[in-house]
């Protein structure tokens, strides 16, 4: 094969897509990662997994790159005399200083996989609002097509206030990262997604991993009815105003739901 033909093959190669999994503590990010990993193995999908949680006791999925192999979370606590959250933040910042090496590995092996999944610390602010988290997501976005998966706890989102709080936080992450963001409603095996579907219109569904529904909030009538059932007048009024203010965010924001098998 001559050099021109070789360069044409390289130029036609599809770059792997990065999905950064974030969400509040307890929303099931790592469990979802484990199910994604299992699905990829069962379906023969070429995927690469990265763990960025330095404090996790054990990773329930096969991580190709693990921050714990580079940074010792407990030693960071001792050396810098930090608490748990401070040590997580510092560990992530230390790892970020070497993340260009991770990018180099991913670029060299880019033809070996189609998807890259990145699990983040349980404390969402440690990644989304830290210098280390910003460095990592910017390096990934500069090298590969990158999307943020914002995981929400479906049972807790039955509360209209919690639902609105999650959407506000998702909007702030979208605004700060400037990356495509998909809201994923997790734990639908515990609480069905029907209540959220009633708050949405133009619903389209498709099978992705377990169950995924792409939705766009285009009509707030059902959400307004749910607000009417709340007893706190101040919160009801605030949520009603916020739902209208954020109309443009809802209108074009893809929402997914998933459950464990």
Protein language model features and the residues they cover:
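N-terminal regions of ATP-driven nucleic-acid and macromolecular assemblies
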Residues: 2-8, 16, 54, 73-81, ...
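Nucleotide-state-sensitive switch-loop elements of NTP-binding domains
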Residues: 2-147
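Structured core elements
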Residues: 20, 117, 182, 256-257
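Cofactor-binding loop segments of dinucleotide-utilizing enzymes, especially the Rossmann-like FAD-
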Residues: 24, 52, 151-153, 186, ...
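Conserved catalytic-core segment of NTP-binding enzymes
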Residues: 125-248
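Phosphate-binding beta-loop-alpha motif at adenosine-nucleotide cofactor sites
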Residues: 253-261
């Amino acid at each position: 094969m001559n050099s021109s033909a070789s360069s044409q093959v390289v130029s036609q190669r599809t770059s792997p897509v990065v999905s950064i999994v974030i969400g509040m503590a307890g929303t099931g990010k790592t469990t979802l990662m484990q199910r994604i990993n299992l699905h990829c193995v069962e379906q023969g999908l070429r995927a690469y997994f990265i763990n960025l949680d330095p404090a996790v006791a054990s990773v329930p999925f096969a991580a190709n790159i693990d921050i714990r192999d580079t940074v010792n979370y407990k030693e960071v606590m001792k050396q810098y005399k930090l608490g748990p959250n401070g040590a997580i933040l510092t560990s992530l910042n230390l790892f970020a200083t070497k993340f260009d090496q991770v990018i180099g590995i991913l670029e060299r092996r880019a033809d070996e996989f189609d998807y890259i999944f990145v699990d983040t610390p349980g404390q969402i602010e440690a990644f989304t609002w830290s210098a280390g988290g910003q460095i990592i997501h910017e390096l990934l976005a500069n090298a590969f097509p990158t999307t943020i998966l914002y995981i929400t706890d479906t049972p807790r989102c039955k509360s209209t206030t919690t639902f609105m709080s999650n959407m506000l936080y998702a909007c702030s992450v979208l605004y700060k990262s400037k990356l495509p963001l998909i809201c994923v409603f997790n734990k639908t095996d515990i609480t069905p997604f029907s209540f959220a579907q009633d708050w949405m219109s133009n619903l389209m569904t498709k099978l992705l991993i377990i169950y995924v529904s792409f939705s766009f909030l285009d009509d707030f009538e059902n959400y307004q009815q749910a607000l009417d059932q709340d007893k706190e007048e101040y919160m009801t009024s605030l949520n009603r105003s916020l739902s209208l203010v954020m109309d443009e965010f809802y209108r074009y924001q893809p929402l997914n739901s998933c459950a464990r098998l």
